Amino acid sequence: MNQDTICAIATAQGGAIGSIRVSGPEAITITGRIFTPAKSGKLLSEQKPYTLTFGRIYNGEEMIDEVLVSLFRAPHSYTGEDSTEITCHGSSYILQQVMQLLIKNGCRMAQPGEYTQRAFLNGKMDLSQAEAVADLIASSSAATHRLALSQMRGGFSKELTTLREKLLNFTSMIELELDFSEEDVEFADRSALRRLADEIEEVIARLANSFSVGNVIKNGVPVAIIGETNAGKSTLLNVLLNEDKAIVSDIHGTTRDVIEDTVNIGGITFRFIDTAGIRETSDTIESLGIERTFQKLDQAEIVLWMIDSADAISQLTLLSDKILPRCEHKQLILVFNKVELINETQKNELASQFSEHIGSEIESIFISAKQRLHTDELQQRLVAAAHLPTVTQNDVIVTNVRHYEALTRALDAIHRVQEGLDANISGDFLSQDIRECIFHLSDIAGEVTNDMVLQNIFAHFCIGK
């Protein structure tokens, strides 16, 4: 393990307060070289751990700032190493001066994610918990925050530990039987092993299946805004995002490519996708945009079909022939836009005609994106259509693609064990599949993960974490 002492700014620029983290075998010594306690007369190394000490940072005779230094001794720190945290004023000049002094006295600049990587390598957390730290930092909704917190606190890790213990018990019984194969003694009751395999399979399957919900919670519910040209799709996107993300124009075919962005509505992250308007065109670029429109439609969980209320009937054929067949397993909401251009009688007639033509079970709403009429109600409809479960900090839901892939491979291995037990195959073949299952579960926790995978994971962290 690298024994360098590292330092990094842990706070964003522009705040009133700044924080610098120092970790490694010389963290306390190096910090003590530039820090002078204000009152106690004790050196920093003589201070009690888990305390704050007020004092000053000096560059020779020149005072840089008045600061607070917190002291942590190994192994009782975030990284498991001796650590200090210097809290100073948030001036970028002050922060850079302190960093230069630390580096001059023996620190080196930390790499992205190096603090959390050291915590993992020092056994302070497993790899799934380390990844949860990054998820917690990136959390943008109550649900993503709760899931990241649950995983960081070890909820997922406990499930994995329990599974591995059961699998190790399983394989030990099988291998004990192999050791005494010449004695014709059966140590492992096959029916009991089948019940244990079923129990393990049920837990792994539950965790793997939870990814469909976890992925949506983490990355946002994909909502495709679809419709003919000039139906008001880009205007609606700007209203939902509360910013001018998309260009709005009366010219048909203005949007030629997909525009995506996320926003939190009612505690749920939605990923809105504005698409090119659907129409017959000879323009090659616009045609490619329309192809992408249908690709995004297929990927969406919720589809908003935007309709120009003043020209709605002409869209019935397109809706029936091309849109409805693709939305069989999706939440489709018909959004009649530009409602200010029609009267109440016309509005009722439109609702009746569409209901008669495509069925009354499809949800619809009349809005004016330009005038922001009933857009709040549309947001409420989106929250209801998301159908996401209420998430608590005790829930174990998989949100990480790497974890999902490992669980899928573990599930395949345990399925082979079940099939092998049913076929009464030799214990040595069963043992191979059990060990493969253990391997994939251990990979999630980082017990068998190679260095390249670790570097890729921690490279996505910020410098100060």
Swiss-Prot record:
Q: What is the lineage of its organism?
A: Bacteria, Pseudomonadati, Bacteroidota, Bacteroidia, Bacteroidales
- Single GO MF annotation: GTP binding
Which amino acids does the record list as binding (6S)-5-formyl-5,6,7,8-tetrahydrofolate? Answer: 21, 85, 124, 465
Co-factor binding details = Binds 1 potassium ion per subunit.
Which cofactors must be present for this protein to function?
K(+)
What EC identifiers does the entry list?
3.6.-.-
Q: Which family does it belong to?
A: Belongs to the TRAFAC class TrmE-Era-EngA-EngB-Septin-like GTPase superfamily. TrmE GTPase family.
Gene encoding this chain?
Answer: mnmE
Enzyme superclass (EC): hydrolase
| Amino-acid positions noted as binding K(+) in the UniProt annotation, renumbered to this chain | 230, 249, 251, 254
Instruction: State what protein this is by name.
Output: tRNA modification GTPase MnmE
Q: Provide the binding site for Mg(2+).
A: 234, 255
Please describe what this protein does: Exhibits a very high intrinsic GTPase hydrolysis rate. Involved in the addition of a carboxymethylaminomethyl (cmnm) group at the wobble position (U34) of certain tRNAs, forming tRNA-cmnm(5)s(2)U34.
**Which Gene Ontology cellular component annotation is one that this UniProt entry carries?**
cytosol
Binding site residues for GTP: 230-235, 249-255, 274-277
Tell me the ranges covered by the TrmE-type G domain, including all copies. 220-387
User: Could you tell me which PROSITE patterns the record lists for this protein?
Assistant: G_TRME
Record's PANTHER family?
TRNA MODIFICATION GTPASE GTPBP3, TRNA MODIFICATION GTPASE GTPBP3, MITOCHONDRIAL
**What is the organism field in this record?**
Bacteroides fragilis (strain ATCC 25285 / DSM 2151 / CCUG 4856 / JCM 11019 / LMG 10263 / NCTC 9343 / Onslow / VPI 2553 / EN-2)
